[in-house]
């Protein structure tokens, strides 16, 4: 019946909300012209206001707090007036002796609100602004009460009795003072079963005989009165037999209240939908951050979600939390099922900063938003062509219905899809429904389409004030500028530019614009999470000492709490904003990696891990850890890298295609090649290739990585023709899917293959082409490596090219020694020694110190890498130099090192166990 069940998504009047209204009458009494009693200072008055505001916005639980908890918090908030506040609250409840008193109470609540069109207000007049947060709360309570039917009023009256009885039993158990219980005992002694129907019936007869007028809530037919009487009696008997304690669900970072003594329908005591959604968002963050730890209980989360879904089935975010929980529990079939449920049930109702469309139609169940969700799901599951078709349809419907917000999000999703997935051609799919793409040219490349979509999405998001989308688009534009050379659509004519290079200044500008616009997040409407987090933190701090005790523990209540102690929580931003700021630092780190500045890349990664590690998504945090581990492997060696990798494996979930697993396989492959264990290296290549999806265009980064490592393994095995075939096939794939940066690496690999096969002349064009690509994309460190390979190729043509090779090497030396890793620096040192030894115009006796210093540096750096082949070459050259100088002891020592590395290279099985 109406009023006995909670309407989905409705704001319901509950005993807790009545408690807040009673306290609001104290905070802002009607027609008060000065500081109201019992406040002795403005600070006390403001502190109670902060407390009431926190009660209406906190999202630390799904259930409203019990009266016992409310009284305990009042003792912390009220300081010396806590006893008066508690007595007033309990006395006011005891004065609600009939449903008529509830009507009078809510009529009195109108008096604390100021008029919406009021004129001049005196300075010392206390009026609750109807449009303020507390004013809106009071107005919603009054409206919700006025909408209650007669059964609803009776049920609310009955729930107040249970609310007060529960507090009485709790305080009696812990020996509460008698002066705080007198009012509650009155409620405990009331026979609400007899009163619920007998007293109203007597009043009906009295009112009829006296004046013929019946109060609004008693103006009810006899049949309905009898039905309600039976219903209330049955509910009372059921609640008495079902009284039992239930343990609190241990949700991570969550609920502090226990779900005790379910005397009435628990759904009636749920918090508002906004508060519950804020709580669920915090739980989603907790599952992502702590879901893989051993202390995290997925079963308790599941039981909590089951309970919430029964109480509030309209909250579709429950399916998303269940998906995350199942995912971290390795139950992938259940995770997929819940994810599909979330997309099915929540399309158009959650998850977007929506702006009302110009048509004014309903915002719920929008078809275009359902298409957007479906397209993103196809994208995440690795179905790029299906995703592109669905997103194209979403663009068409969004334009047809004038939903500019959904159109902006869809364009951003399409540009992200085209950037991340390998789509060779979009003809026949993209462009038919979106006029800016269609009108520009019919033969646009995928790269040009991505750029147009990004610019259009950015323009629309900026005009609609979608700050998060604007910031996200700026970061996407920075990534586009980093990875692609912008060529004009019409690249001919006398004024056509011949300079085709990426612009690091543009990349930096886009990143800074994204971070700058994120600071304006407060202008958006989605501030529920901000206020909820602040309010929850403020309420939790009521139970903590604010600082060193000013008064001795025996001196009574704490008086050092002031209004200004809220400053501890002045800085609080939504998780999505924090993740975007962190993503900008990760993008900075990636750009510095490509540009070749290892210190800057490491610094930005450390900034991210330090400032945003706790608030970031598990995927971004995992990426930051792996960047630091890669830095350790390149500049410190495998021992430190594997130690850090072990920590990362414990922290993050290691599943198929996880970043931790991929990095582990990459490090194992590098170490296997350096140690000469080619069988292990080939097995790891097969594992990497097996992790990639067989679908065309999916997992392109992983496929390129596996092919590169396969070619390098074949090169180490001296199977030059097969290695060249794999590299050529990989280059064709990169060209087909417009992977320009990967082209530079593949060309450099082809030059290495020809160099080691003895065909230096054939390797020169590949090295020069790689350098050209590096110049276009500002890949300074890769260019230095390609220059070193080019110098080695020139030296391979004969000793008469020694000077040219040395000039090339010395030109790249600043970049190699300043930013190169251990292997690159060792190669440069060994090659420099080779040049001096091959130069017929130089003498070993005169340049011996230069040669030996280079070889010693190379030997020391190769020791950490366990690179036996290069280390053996360095030891061999050192032995030759010592032999020409007649230093026999040093020659024998270098020869023994050479023998040691050769033996280790020929017997790799001895080190295979250490790689697992």
From Swiss-Prot:
This is Anaphase-promoting complex subunit 5. The lineage of its organism: Eukaryota, Viridiplantae, Streptophyta, Embryophyta, Tracheophyta. InterPro entries: Apc5 (IPR037679), Apc5_dom (IPR026000). It holds the Pfam family ANAPC5. The APC/C is composed of at least 10 subunits. Interacts with PYM. One of its GO terms (biological process) is protein ubiquitination. The keyword Chaperone does not apply. Keywords: Cell cycle, Cell division, Mitosis, Nucleus, Ubl conjugation pathway. One of its GO terms (cellular component) is anaphase-promoting complex. Residues 234-255 are annotated as: Disordered.
